[in-house]
Amino acid sequence: MFKKIEHTNYSPIQPVLVWDGDCGFCKFWKTRWELKTKGKIEFKTYQEVANNFPDIPLKEFKKSSKLIEPNGKVYNGPDSAYRCIYYSGNKIWHKLYTKYKIFQHLSDHGYNHIAKNRSFYFKLTKILLGNNPTSLKHFWIFYLLIIIVLVYWVL
């Protein structure tokens, strides 16, 4: 499980999401959030900028993404994703994460599971949403309809 780091003494000029540049799943969602946040967040790989934050252990950058704000506040794992979404104007996910311990627990464990199975979830993401993160296709609706029809037909 990733460690929740709360603060860095090496704050950036603007919010920065630090992610794993070797992860296709991470790159897919980084591209999506970069489009949605419209320049409000800088996106950098930990391979590029880990040395800029010497008080955050490299192993923690490898375990989870980090959103680091100009005041030094650090958001980790799923909350770094929710905070990115927050910057795009959808504040509900970050609020749920900070307000409800059960949502935080499920998010943290879900994130940890996905982090350990990135290849599988990257394939699943592309099957359900398409290959282009800037123009998502909602194939999952079609798959759901097929399942509903098959279940109805069998019963």
Predicted regions span which residues?
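Charged, low-complexity, helix/coiled-coil-prone segments
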Residues: W19-F28, Q47-L58, G110
